[in-house]
């Protein structure tokens, strides 16, 4: 069975394992999520389910979203995301899925979120380029470096790493261990850091590349 969940990043803390070793963890408010649509090959060309998460005032929704929730007869939700599944018929419309139904301690997950915005950044911060010499007479400290050849090709190649906006990108961190699942409070503790700021939306899925 596929494992997936939507959540909200709360922050980081630390816990101790049975051997007394300290483990840095991210606390995630995970679910519950509600199934709002099923997609099948006959109608959409592929199998998936769309799920909703997070309470929101109805006035914050657009007309298609209002219509979707009104048709289902459920409270409006802030986020709607789609997950690929093998068989959508295993899920029912308006079905509520809780975190303990999907994940247990010891599972490994991939967590996707939107990274923190860093504003306009140079190539050293943005891409980790080496800096230039700080010696007397050097005018090259934090600059870009070579921009290409001269007369030919007479242009800067596409993909050249240059200063620009950093962050606010979709980032996935793979193979994180699930340390604890708190069913009563809908909390999930994941070892290590996950993308995004506090309160940011996270997509949590069963890992696709298991560690050897």
Curated annotation (Swiss-Prot):
Gene Ontology cellular component terms for the protein in this record: cytosolic large ribosomal subunit
Single biological process term from Gene Ontology: translation
Alphabetized InterPro entries for the sequence: Ribosomal_uL3 (IPR000597), Ribosomal_uL3_bac/org-type (IPR019927), Ribosomal_uL3_CS (IPR019926), Transl_B-barrel_sf (IPR009000)
MF (Gene Ontology): rRNA binding; structural constituent of ribosome
Function as written in the Swiss-Prot or TrEMBL entry: One of the primary rRNA binding proteins, it binds directly near the 3'-end of the 23S rRNA, where it nucleates assembly of the 50S subunit.
Database matches in NCBIfam families: L3_bact
Identification of the protein by name: Large ribosomal subunit protein uL3
Species in which this protein is naturally found: Acetivibrio thermocellus (strain ATCC 27405 / DSM 1237 / JCM 9322 / NBRC 103400 / NCIMB 10682 / NRRL B-4536 / VPI 7372) (Clostridium thermocellum)
